[in-house]
């Protein structure tokens, strides 16, 4: 028995009982005094970190009192911008998408009217037990449109006009709690950071969740395997979209039982979800074209009507709830984003207007860049049209415009800062057609000169 005891070892460090001062036995395990000391040190360090985080959060609260100087949406009903005012501002920043801008203007106006109504009723009933007032529910927004059509820009412009915190989240990085990836609460942390950790201000903000179509479940029928980045994320987002008190870890990452969390009421936050929903047109066309495809169609008039119905450009205007369910969104999720706006695919004419009309148009941006080098940049009308035509061919929406102009202006911006004698440069249609490059000619003396080409 004594020989057997001599071979007892610590289950954690592997040292025998002869190498340590004390070996404590448990049900099938042993731990030495050195490992116990190490555990105590780890616990003391974690306790110290928790106290430090608590002190830091208290300091943040002292620095950010309720009377934060940063402005937010006034909750007086008469001060909330009217839908016509909101759309007018959107018109100055976003070209086209008239229907989507109208839907967004009304939805945003109603959302902040709802917040004003809530504040009014709370103040009215603070000294009364009567709570018979009508409760207004929140209506989140779903934007459906091809890539580069302006979904993110619309949401960002709304937040700029209303002067509220705005955060963008990518749905593709989200996973269900307990799996590798981001928890849905990290979306709220981004909004908090934009609000300088002011909870009251963040609760009046706007969150745009991009690529929402990427969390559609992989098949229409529920799967026996767990879909942690698809349907699982939709389930996790339900309460947040509807309105709940969410616990947000101030440092990000996973929630920890020993770490303090910031509580945010999401019932006042406006969620705008956007996605391209590639393939949704096919689902709509299949549903609408069933009755008039096949041998049962006898009249020529029916054939003409069928072509009109299944036109891909117009099919999403006839979108129904069942189409989104077939695409992979669960009904509970769709029910929490009742306002749906479909964005049009950008035409050549719209792309041409995007280049020149908005306040931050690309042509204006590059003119400003070259003006810093004392060079006046000009675009011939034909060159703007040629750039828009090339962007339309690439089928990536307005995003293609910047890449084309960057490629077109590369040699120009590389050489012009060193050419003090050039005060003006003109982009022509011929430059765009000739693989987007301007000619740089070497003179016999070794100096370089940019030759302007005429159309």
Curated annotation (Swiss-Prot):
Output one GO MF annotation: ATP binding
Q: Where does Zn(2+) bind?
A: 10, 13, 32, 35
Top-rank lineage group of the source organism: Bacteria
Chain residues that bind ATP = 146-153
Cellular component GO terms held in the UniProt record:
HslUV protease complex
Q: Which UniProt keywords apply?
A: ATP-binding, Chaperone, Metal-binding, Nucleotide-binding, Zinc
Q: Which Pfam families match?
A: AAA_2, ClpB_D2-small, zf-C4_ClpX
Q: Where is the ClpX-type ZB domain?
A: 1-51
Q: Which GO terms describe its biological process?
A: cell division; proteolysis involved in protein catabolic process
InterPro entries assigned? AAA+_ATPase, ATP-dep_Clp_protease_ClpX, ATPase_AAA_core, Clp_ATPase_C, Clp_protease_ATP-bd_su_ClpX, ClpX_bact, P-loop_NTPase, Znf_CppX_C4
Protein task: ATP-dependent specificity component of the Clp protease. It directs the protease to specific substrates. Can perform chaperone functions in the absence of ClpP.
Share what the entry says about its subunit structure, partners included: Component of the ClpX-ClpP complex. Forms a hexameric ring that, in the presence of ATP, binds to fourteen ClpP subunits assembled into a disk-like structure with a central cavity, resembling the structure of eukaryotic proteasomes.
HAMAP family attached to this UniProt entry: ClpX
The family annotation for this protein states: Belongs to the ClpX chaperone family.
Name listed for the protein in its UniProt record: ATP-dependent Clp protease ATP-binding subunit ClpX
Species name: Prochlorococcus marinus (strain MIT 9215)
């Amino acid at each position: 028995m004594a020989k057997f005891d001599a071979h007892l070892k610590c289950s954690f460090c592997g040292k025998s009982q002869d190498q340590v001062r004390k070996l404590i036995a448990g049900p099938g395990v042993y731990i030495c005094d050195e490992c116990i000391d190490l555990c105590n040190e780890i616990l003391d360090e974690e306790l110290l970190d928790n106290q430090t985080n608590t002190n830091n959060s208290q300091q943040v609260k002292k620095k950010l009192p309720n009377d934060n100087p940063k402005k937010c949406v006034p909750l007086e009903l008469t001060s909330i911008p009217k839908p016509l005012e909101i759309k007018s501002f959107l018109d100055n920043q976003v070209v086209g998408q008239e229907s989507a801008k109208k839907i967004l203007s009304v939805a945003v106006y109603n959302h902040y009217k709802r917040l004003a109504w809530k504040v009014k009723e709370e103040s009215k009933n603070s000294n009364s037990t009567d709570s018979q007032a009508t409760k207004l529910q929140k209506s989140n927004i779903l934007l459906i449109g091809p890539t580069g059509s302006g979904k993110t820009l619309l949401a960002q412009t709304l937040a700029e006009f209303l002067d509220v915190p705005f955060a963008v989240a990518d749905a593709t990085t989200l996973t269900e709690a307990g799996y590798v990836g981001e928890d849905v609460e990290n979306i709220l942390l981004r909004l908090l950071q934009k609000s300088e950790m002011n909870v009251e201000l963040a609760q009046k903000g706007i969150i745009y969740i991009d690529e929402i179509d990427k969390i559609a479940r992989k098949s229409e029928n529920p799967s026996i395997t767990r879909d942690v980045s698809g349907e699982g994320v939709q389930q996790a987002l339900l309460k947040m979209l509807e309105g709940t008190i969410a616990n947000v870890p101030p440092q990000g990452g996973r929630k920890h039982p020993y770490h303090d969390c910031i509580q945010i009421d999401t019932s006042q936050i406006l969620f705008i979800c956007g996605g391209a929903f590639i393939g949704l047109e096919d689902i709509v066309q299949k549903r609408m074209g069933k009755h008039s495809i096949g041998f049962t169609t006898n009249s020529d008039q029916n054939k003409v009507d069928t072509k009109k119905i299944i036109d891909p450009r117009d099919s999403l205007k006839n979108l129904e709830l069942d189409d989104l369910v077939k695409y992979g969104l669960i009904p509970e999720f769709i029910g929490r984003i009742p306002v749906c706006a479909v964005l049009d695919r950008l035409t050549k004419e719209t792309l041409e207007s995007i280049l020149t009309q908005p306040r931050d148009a690309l042509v204006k941006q590059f003119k400003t860049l070259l003006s810093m080098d004392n060079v006046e940049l000009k675009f011939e009308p034909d060159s703007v049209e040629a750039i828009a035509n090339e962007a339309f061919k690439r089928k990536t929406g307005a995003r293609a415009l910047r890449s084309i102009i960057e490629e077109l202006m590369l040699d120009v911006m590389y050489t012009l800062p060193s050419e003090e004698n050039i005060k003006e440069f003109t982009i022509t249609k011929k430059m765009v057609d000739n693989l987007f490059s301007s000619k740089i000619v070497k003179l016999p003396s070794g100096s370089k000169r940019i030759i302007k080409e005429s159309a």
